[in-house]
Amino acid sequence: MDIVGGQNLRQMWDDLAGVYGDKTALIFESCEGIVRQFSYASINEEINRTANLFYSLGIRKGDRVALHLDNCPEFIFCWFGLAKIGAIMVPINARLLGEESAWILQNSQVSLLVTSAQFYPMYREIRQDNSTPLNHICLIGEQLPADDGVSHFSQLQARQSATLCYTPALSTDDTAEILFTSGTTSRPKGVVITHYNLRFAGYYSAWQIALRDDDVYMTVMPAFHIDCQCTAAMPAFSAGSTFVLLEKYSARAFWDQVRKYQATVTECIPMMIRTLMVQPAAPTDRQHHLREVMFYLNLSAQEKDAFTERFGVRLLTSYGMTETIVGIIGDRPGDKRRWPSIGRVGFSYEAEIRDDQNRPLPAGEIGEICIKGIPGKTIFKEYYMQPEATARALEPEGWLHTGDSGYQDEDGYFYFVDRRCNMIKRGGENVSCVELENIISAHPKIQDIVVVGIKDAIRDEAIKAFIVLNEGETLSEAEFFSFCENNMAKFKVPSFMEIRTDLPRNCSGKIIKKNLK
């Protein structure tokens, strides 16, 4: 079943502008509380002007342009402006430093960058090193340095027509984006995403949360991340909903923003759930319009129940990764939810559990979660310029090896166990980091927890726990180890513990374990 019907992103926006016109498409709120709002018709004009801006700078179909931006409307304009002329967006994680950013520029052969003033000093150094093909920077902001090869985004865009001046032939198979994975354990890989991928993501995720044109979808997820793009922005726009994009996450402001914009759907990661729960309880906690909170791994049953009870809104679990584009396994609209299951496989996909010899496993047995989709349509097309890595992850028949461990029950519900690289081998036993983290997080004094494996001459690996305590709490080693011994098998009890003020995280809130070993 082809639900995209050959429609590329240029056609999508022209159609949306015609159908929804003056209806609000995008609301953006900055950290300072400044609000900018765009209708479907006006945002399409902004996108067209931005497309013409890129054309005026020499960008043509197939060229790659990098974006290094925090959340802002200009990210949306650039994303779809590039797509309208067949060019390719290369979003860069806004937290990356110079060497990491330069590596992405070099490996994607980017000559033009759009960024903001706060990141400009880093890129000025990169250009001076001559280590990348970068030769022009388009800056967003009020200040414009008097440097060669630098232009001002707002000034250039304001000069452009709202009618496209360059309309090359487009296909849904054309690449729209190269999104580099977070690379917490090695160099990031460029995930190639097509026009079809993004259109499909919009329809699929809108189905998953039963999104309608009277919904308001609010997100704080970074726009350079797959979650914001394919489980928030694309479904919101595809359904004709209103998309609310916040510049940054604030636990203190979050519920006020939900109420202010009358959001009906939002998305959260575990870090957000936990920080929202430590805010002082208020009589207004349940006074909102949210009907769904899209949720991504991992959370203990105690944390899930406490959140649902306090705020009166359920979590809709969705499992996926950059390569799957969307949450290919998850809760379904109107279907039973079986916590801690991650749900059932969505339409257009197949899923099964396989052993180390790549053979399907029966219900109840733990193995690798494998997903079948159509490359370039329902799953990513390939890793950019890395055919060997593509071949390792993606079988010719469309089966994707996720690298995650899980199992399936007799009713077709899937259960996530751990990232396969997140298993600790201890004295012949496989220990799931997630299992231990869920158990330990139930301790009333602990706010955040991560466990890692460290080398052990006798038992392969020993287990070390890094802990962040709730404000004002103290925790002795004796108290910690006693709690563990009472709540888990002896071979799972950590050998070491370390208390920290915070844990290192990447842009999507995932803990960077390599920084803890």
From Swiss-Prot:
**Pfam families from the xrefs?**
AMP-binding, AMP-binding_C
Tell whether DNA damage is among the UniProt keywords: no
Reaction it catalyzes: 4-(trimethylamino)butanoate + ATP + CoA = 4-(trimethylamino)butanoyl-CoA + AMP + diphosphate; crotonobetaine + ATP + CoA = crotonobetainyl-CoA + AMP + diphosphate; (R)-carnitine + ATP + CoA = (R)-carnitinyl-CoA + AMP + diphosphate
Q: Which UniProt keywords apply?
A: Ligase
Under Enzyme Commission nomenclature, its number is 6.2.1.48
Q: Does the keyword Plastid apply?
A: no
Q: Which GO terms describe its molecular function?
A: carnitine-CoA ligase activity; crotonobetaine-CoA ligase activity; medium-chain fatty acid-CoA ligase activity
Tell me a GO biological process for this protein.
fatty acid metabolic process
Give the record's pathway. Answer: Amine and polyamine metabolism; carnitine metabolism
Q: Which HAMAP family match?
A: CaiC (MF_01524)
Q: What does this protein do?
A: Catalyzes the transfer of CoA to carnitine, generating the initial carnitinyl-CoA needed for the CaiB reaction cycle. Also has activity toward crotonobetaine and gamma-butyrobetaine.
As for family, the record states: Belongs to the ATP-dependent AMP-binding enzyme family.
Q: What is this protein called?
A: Crotonobetaine/carnitine--CoA ligase
